[in-house]
Amino acid sequence: MTGLISNKTKPEIEPTLGDAPTELVITDLEVGDGAEATAGANVDVHYVGVDFETGEQFDASWDRGASIQFPLNGLIKGWQDGIPGMKVGGRRQLICPPQYAYGPAGGGHRLSGRTLVFVIDLLAVG
C-alpha cells in the first residue's frame, strides 16, 4: 500500500439539521495530496460512523486504536461510490441513505433503514 503516517485525530461529527438526503452526499473536509483511490481498490482508512437522525455513534475504527484495510468492492454502496477519487491524506464525509448503506428497514442488519454519516480518513491505497 502507498500511504502516509496520519497525525490526525478522531473527528467529531456535528449533528445534521434538516431532512435526510435521498442520494449519497459526498463532502471533502480535507483534500489529500497522495495516491488516489480507484473503484475496487484496497484501502486503509480510519473512520467514524453515526446515525443521521440521532447523531449516535455506531462504529469507529479510532476507538479500536487501529485503522482498517479492505477492498472497496466488498463494502456498502456508499463507500464503493464515495471513496474513489479521494486522495491519501484526505478526510471525506459521506451521508449514506439506506440504499447506499444497509438497505431498507427490516433488511436484517441493525442499521437497515437508517441514513448513516461517515467521516473517513484515507491513509493508504494499494
Give the location of each predicted region.
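Cross-family detector of peptidyl-prolyl cis-trans isomerase
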Residues: 1-126
